[in-house]
Amino acid sequence: IAFSRNLPKGVARPVGWEVLKLKAVRDPWPGSHVRQAMVLTGSDVRGTIYAIYEFSRRSLGVDPIYWWTDHPPARRTSVVIPAGFEEQQGSPTFRYRGWFMNDEDLLTVWRPGKADKTGISLAVWDRIFEALLRLKGNMIIPNTFIFPYEPQVRAAGDRGLAITQHHMEPLGLNVYQWPDNVPYSLD
């Protein structure tokens, strides 16, 4: 996995929004013990994430939704990359692509641990985020009635996903939380 500072000679960092590049390189770092390398890089962080997942799909046979379909990838003893292999996928047609986790209560059968403090286990949230990234998504609405301090919001951001909202959280504010120290009445 290469970023600008460690790209092998002859491999240029792609340019654009979320562009990924895969390239087989011989003698990538002259003078080192590495004779061949498969370079996975991107124009930005998500482009690099997509390069990793594209390599795992194409070369390792990992289905983007393997966990959800109960089809784990087959174990491999070796991977053959054709000499001179190179692929670059340009910027996506649509700048933002994502999911709205509507009816997320249907996933609550995967109970969270007490430390999760969320309706769905953080381990399951991680699988949701992984599948979205493997499918080259980049944004998510993680819940209805979500608060910005909830752990799944941070977890999505840590995975490189943009957080967005829908009509229930105008401007990112969940208006259904009333401060504990302010009296209210439904009368």
Stretches with model-predicted labels:
Residues 1-7, 93-187:
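Aromatic-lined carbohydrate-binding surfaces of glycoside hydrolases
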Residues 1-91:
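Contiguous, structured surface segment used for ligand recognition
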